[in-house]
Amino acid sequence: MSESEHHRSLVQALAIEIFGDLIWNNKPIVYCDIQDGCSSEPPLIGNNRPDVFARDIATSLSIIGEAKTASDIDNLHTSMQLTSFFDYLRDSPRGEFWLGVPWLSAGTAIRVSMGIRQKLNAEHIPICVVAFMIGNTTLRRIWRV
């Protein structure tokens, strides 16, 4: 599986996880950046477009989801993206940040996202890291930090 195919499968799996999470009181509006003709593109947040953006208008809950392959978690580009996303969520009434990664990359994803959240004094924003088995995104493990 190429890097872009792997990223696309992570985005799709993350969108399904977010949509199916029990946090929603109502079905959320979900925007997913996979250009499949079935979903609209997520909005720009700062200068960055997340892979998934979900919102329940009635409860003001927003979830920003980002999928990262193993080689793309701990770098400047991701740091800038996550900074934009935590800035947005920090000023939202209710929000969560979700990160979808390959199974063996969960520790790095938790470390990077918690570090940026702490740097921005946004510890009140929940982080959910979903680690998927490569090639079988129905096998996953979830960490909420």
What do these predicted regions represent?
Residues 100-145:
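Domain-level recognition of nuclease-like catalytic cores that cleave nucleotide substrates
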Residues 1-19:
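Nuclease catalytic cores
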Residues 9-15, 76-85, 109-116:
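Well-ordered, non-membrane alpha-helical segments in soluble/globular domains
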Residues 65-68, 98-103:
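Conserved beta-strand segments of the P-loop GTPase G domain that flank and frequently precede/overlap
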Residues 2-6, 24-60:
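Active-site metal-binding core of divalent-cation-utilizing nuclease and nuclease-like domains
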Residues 86-95, 118-122:
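Arginine/glycine-rich "motif VI" loop of SF2 helicases in the C-terminal RecA-like domain
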Residues 44, 71-76, 104-107:
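Acidic-and-aromatic substrate-binding clefts and catalytic sites of carbohydrate-active enzymes
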Residues 52-78, 82-85:
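Conserved catalytic cores of phosphodiester-cleaving nucleases, focusing on short active-site segments
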